[in-house]
């Protein structure tokens, strides 16, 4: 409920919290429990799910793999929750930030992926506000290490448009594949794709060019070298106002790039 007013921006664009909530509601999902430092697995589907495992990977901000664990194999009945299946070994040195990547697999195939960034110095809530509608903090997490992430200029993207009927009167779908091609260990952190009005040569039009009415399947993703992800967005071709669809990809530690959604 505290995220209710943060799911969409005032221009209807999907904010980062939208995709966080969406991930948490996937049928099979692994969760890093901040209070316990362990992994919880849940089955929100209506049927039993068998052959389910979870792999947890811990990276530092330089891209070094610090910990890699695999769970036992589980069969979960509908609405089943299993706590403490893994305990990723995150950094505890003051000022450190760890990335935790959780890969949920069913019969060996990845069905869910989730990434957390965990500070060694966490948020501390003011105890007097427990149970109140608006809790306050007595101290904040130290995430300053993210400011020193190495730059990554090796993120690439492709975008393809197809005609397909979708929600809210949409008639087009753009499929975007983002890849981290870095030959070093550099992560691509919080990468976001946006659909924009542009030119046939891939330039964005001046002014307010984003199609905020487009609906994305996922966004704000984090990728390590060799990893890629595919996102889709549905939109109404009328919202282009005669322009060419162009997809921009930007991120915390990468320069913005634009590609034509041909």
Language model feature labels by segment:
Residues 1-219, 223-233, 242, 246:
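Carbohydrate-binding surfaces of carbohydrate-active enzymes
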Residues 253-260:
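Eukaryote-biased activation of long, low-complexity terminal tails and linkers
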